[in-house]
């Protein structure tokens, strides 16, 4: 399903989704705009509430500093196991292709709910 992630988070009951993806959310690359990024500890907590034990959170970006922020945010929720950086099968998105064309490295993070 493709939809506005924030709208779905607010409306869905716990355990609704087995797999949640946020692929290439807006990186807000200017330092003064970093606080506008979607992936933060509150977002991770809300997403983990939506998945059952064994469910996964998949994040992807082509901005290294955003990847660092995503890694740190995933670590804030103890219900998640360590994030893997092995890319799971998925289509190449338009934003991903833009990043590749610009020479940026793609980072995929996949964390599984363990408790």
Where do the model's predicted regions map?
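Short "lid" loop at the C-terminus of a central beta-strand within the Rossmann-like core
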Residues: 7, 27, 64-66
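Conserved SAM-binding strand-loop segment of SAM-dependent methyltransferases
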Residues: 1-5
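Glycine/threonine-rich flexible loop motifs
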Residues: 29-38
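Class I S-adenosyl-L-methionine
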Residues: 69-115
């Amino acid at each position: 399903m493709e939809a506005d992630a924030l709208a779905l988070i607010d409306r869905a009951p716990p355990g609704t989704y087995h797999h949640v993806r946020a692929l290439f959310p807006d990186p807000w690359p200017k330092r003064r705009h970093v606080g506008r990024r979607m992936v933060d500890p509150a977002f991770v907590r809300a997403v983990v509430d939506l998945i059952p034990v064994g469910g996964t959170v998949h994040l992807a970006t082509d901005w290294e500093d955003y990847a660092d922020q995503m890694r740190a945010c995933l670590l804030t929720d103890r219900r998640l196991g360590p994030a893997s950086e092995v890319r799971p099968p998925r289509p190449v998105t338009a934003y991903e292709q833009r990043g590749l064309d610009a020479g940026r490295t793609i980072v995929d993070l996949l964390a599984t709910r363990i408790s």
